[in-house]
Amino acid sequence: MGNCFAKNHGLMKPQQNGNTTRSVEVGVTNQDPPSYTPQARTTQQPEKPGSVNSQPPPWRAAAAAPGLSPKTTTKSNSILENAFEDVKLFYTLGKELGRGQFGVTYLCTENSTGKKYACKSISKKKLVTKADKDDMRREIQIMQHLSGQPNIVEFKGAYEDEKAVNLVMELCAGGELFDRIIAKGHYTERAAASVCRQIVNVVKICHFMGVLHRDLKPENFLLSSKDEKALIKATDFGLSVFIEEGKVYRDIVGSAYYVAPEVLRRRYGKEVDIWSAGIILYILLSGVPPFWAETEKGIFDAILEGHIDFESQPWPSISSSAKDLVRRMLTADPKRRISAADVLQHPWLREGGEASDKPIDSAVLSRMKQFRAMNKLKKLALKVIAENIDTEEIQGLKAMFANIDTDNSGTITYEELKEGLAKLGSKLTEAEVKQLMDAADVDGNGSIDYIEFITATMHRHRLESNENLYKAFQHFDKDSSGYITIDELESALKEYGMGDDATIKEVLSDVDSDNDGRINYEEFCAMMRSGNPQQQQPRLF
């Protein structure tokens, strides 16, 4: 399951390897971008094209996995509208692979064969609205429909019990696409072409099989194994829909950096997937997205303006053929935008084509690291500031929290948030309230605690005042040495469950501008206040 940003006001969680999140990278500001107006999220019906409509929905078959007991009956709170079934009857769950807003992904072993798979366990507490439940069923339907195709994760089946919907699928043990590129330490146009070819192949397969993806981004691609020549696999179809011939789509969904201009204008078709793939190619070649700003509004403005930078480094050293393909994929007019089939035949992209084997500037890898990892430390620092902020500074927010937390439990539930927003005069739909809930719920436990609420609602300039930044710095600087060492950073990040060893080292490397192996106060403040591709988080209210 995932989020769209029909109107997203909240603090977003970082994308993690193997998780179930599909968050918008940055949230909506208090002003809406031009050329579009917020509206309630609408969900396309999971109708299959062609004669397939005469068959039972694939998700029914997926839910009715081998071993289903004929004595079990469908429960009233069923999401899949089928009998409950314990996934542990067929699979042994192992270690946690990733955690996201909607649940946890585990390594699992099939009891009958001993084969390893991934099990994405999605908490039913997170599936609150009718739209959530429809989306869940549609995601299963689409995954089963596409399963078995190259570069698309193989889907095994869906199992629902009282607490969760469990999706069992192919284990992609090679990790995230960008992690592999960064770890190699060197990179060529030919390597970028190989990656892009597989991503566009996913687009071609989806469109051929009647599916519009709508959320192509690097985080949604994993590597099938740790092998050097491992296939890239698309793993997330939570925002995908079946294409209806002649239908004009109007939902604003996706992730900010990768959204096509026609999505913002609420009139689009399958061409949006080519645009998103073009954004990924631009990042592969340069290390940064072509459109970014301090706010989501700024990103949208840049997308609608349409200026693409081919002058800054490393573009002067990138081949003209590569730039030609990027331009064709990022053509603003969807009618003139290149098709998936034509992308695959482009001289630069096709196998054995013009893409050079000459290494791309190492700065590109550095930028990719920043693009992927920087926000984790910023987010943790903001949480630390919120935990230690003076009570008098947040008296109003404290009262607001108490008013919304009607049962005095110390946490805000979905229902409490919905009622609280209504009292404040909000006219958000249930789906939009749910998005706010997911955005502010940093630890993913289904409710917003006091610190999460303060972090999401305080004005950012107050959180980032000199006094508060210094308090946060002191929190990390445990030995009061005036520096945050790698050990202190590792301890802090792991305390909050954020980041593996590789990410910790990447964060230190990105922030440590004088390369002395530690972070001083000036470097810390510069990191907190600088504009970078992982943007600052907006307010909940």
Swiss-Prot record:
Residues 392-427, 428-463, 464-499, 500-534 form the EF-hand domain. Residues 91-349 form the Protein kinase domain. Ca(2+) 1 binds at residues 405, 407, 409, 411, 416. Ca(2+) 2 binds at residues 441, 443, 445, 447, 452. InterPro entries: CDPK_Ser/Thr_kinases, EF-hand-dom_pair, EF_Hand_1_Ca_BS, EF_hand_dom, Kinase-like_dom_sf, Prot_kinase_dom, Protein_kinase_ATP_BS, Ser/Thr_kinase_AS. One of its GO terms (cellular component) is plasma membrane. It is a lipid-anchor. A lipid is attached at residue 2 (N-myristoyl glycine). It catalyses: L-seryl-[protein] + ATP = O-phospho-L-seryl-[protein] + ADP + H(+); L-threonyl-[protein] + ATP = O-phospho-L-threonyl-[protein] + ADP + H(+). Residues 1-75 are annotated as: Disordered. Pfam families: EF-hand_7, Pkinase. The active site is at 215 (proton acceptor). Belongs to the protein kinase superfamily. Ser/Thr protein kinase family. CDPK subfamily. May play a role in signal transduction pathways that involve calcium as a second messenger. There are 3 contiguous domains conserved in the CDPK subfamily: a kinase domain, an autoinhibitory (junction) domain and a calmodulin-like domain. The autoinhibitory domain (355-385) inactivates kinase activity under calcium-free conditions. This is Calcium-dependent protein kinase 9. It comes from Arabidopsis thaliana.
